[in-house]
Amino acid sequence: MKRFSILVFIFAVAVTAWAVPARKTGVTVIQPDGSKITVYQHGDEHFHWQTNEKGEWIELSENGFYRLTEALSNEQIEAKRAQSIRRAQLAAYPLNVAPRGLVLLVNFADVAFATEKAEMDSMLVGENYTRTYSYTYRGKTYNINSQGSARQYFHDASNGQYNPQFDVVGPVTVSKSMSYYGKNDSYGSDMYPDKMVSEACTIADTVFNVDFTQYDNNNDGEVDFVFVIYAGYGEADGGASTTIWPHSWQLSAAGTRCEVDGKRVNLYACGNELDYYSKMHTGIGTFCHEFSHVLGLPDLYVTNTASHTTMNEWDIMDYGPYNNEGNTPPTFSAYERFFMGWLQPRLIVNPENIELKDLQESNEALLISSTDQHNLIGNNPDPTTFYLVENRQQVGWDEHLPGHGMMLTKIQYSYSRWYQNTVNNSSSKMGVDLIEASGKTDEQGKMTDLFPAGANQYLGITDHAIEAIEENDGVITFKYKGGVEDPGTAVENTQEGQEVIAIYNILGQKQATTNVEDLTAGTYIVVTPSTSHKIVR
């Protein structure tokens, strides 16, 4: 694999905006008459809506009060999402996993950064970064402890194969108010985030003398990416509808052209500075989610009104960015590492006794195919349907997962669904589906989703039984397709699958044992019913 550049099919980056999911925590809003209402956000950057505590659709009226509004069907939502997506040419996109990128801190004309640049530097690229703070929301106190910068996150997720450098510049101040760039159009999409990015780049070039040529790592004439962290709140986690929803997109898809230092700025991602609930700066969760889109990964959460469960807190591309209040996102799953080319799973075919260590420690996973064959190419798999087995433990980046144990994921890859960023919108055709060990799919993120907490076997793959699943000291063991005899017994009684009937030394003297393990150092002839061969101990 090339050190910095791999070829993947990156669909939504080339054709649409990808976004972080709405935060599930409701926001208490005080209305003009002093009454309170709890508002819940749903959807994503393409189309989003709000509900009250009863699940009824609501909207903010011109008089400042929330009122009931007509709920839309899944079909209507999908139609609106499709209309809001500006489509570019569909093609295989050569993704440059850039070793260096630009992060711009951006003030609006009416909202300025509250966080020191030095803190943003440490959070994104610092060595041994730690963060400790507390806050109270709705009478509950949250005590947050986290460690690890965004750079460390991607270093660890890639098993040391990717070490991005994020150069933090700013703050720069754009000319318009937050509401100008962030207000929603009739489809629920932000109006002018592209103009914010373009203007910020131009100002950074002029005021901070940023040399944009150093961010074209593959020298193709285009800056590999720009990440904007904008002042204030974001719409996905409680901010007003006039704030910007964190997302990844292309300026060209919005009809905006930006050129600085002879380089074209196109691919960008953005996220908010402050967390609505703690009123402090956000953790690295949203940054890591959006930057993962830059790398080419799609969203795994449901983007219509369907209520089926997805990967939720188990995955960075679902609700995982909010783990530990947005400070400790889960590491890349085996699938995400496979897709990026940072892990090659082992295809298991024959009966075997399996031992599997924690993914973060080993960077190992297993692949099961119903045909017992696979090309082992993560971003262009053949067959397109397969299973991945990995061991997830509540340590490091996975400390705040709902549980620990063996994770079994079913992949049903579809070019069109990856392209449309609707990977898991259909409950009958999930693209990346967590196989819940307990069989209960009506709850979000629970300990019994994994084996053996939820069950000690899985027989759902015809002729590919996974049985006797155990977990000891963080290590998973199980029998695949019935397993094999105990290794000790097999060595004692067989050689190359056949029973040992006699053993001779090189002088032709028959040994008193047929157990190879009992032999002292030397050269021997091992006899089985059909053959004999020499071994050296």
Regions found by a protein language model. Give the residues of each.
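N-terminal prosegments of processed precursors
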Residues: 18-95, 357
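Short, acidic, Ser/Thr-enriched surface-loop or helix-capping motifs
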Residues: 31, 218, 505
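Active-site-proximal segment of zinc-dependent metalloprotease catalytic domains
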Residues: 81-310, 314, 318-331, 336, ...
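Positively charged n-region of N-terminal signal peptides that target proteins for export
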Residues: 1-6, 537
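Non-catalytic C-terminal accessory/binding modules of secreted extracellular proteins
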Residues: 31, 114-115, 122, 131-156, ...
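A residue-level detector for well-ordered beta-strand positions
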Residues: 28, 286-289, 501-502
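Sec-dependent N-terminal signal peptides
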Residues: 4-14
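C-terminal outer-membrane/trafficking sorting elements
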Residues: 15, 486-537
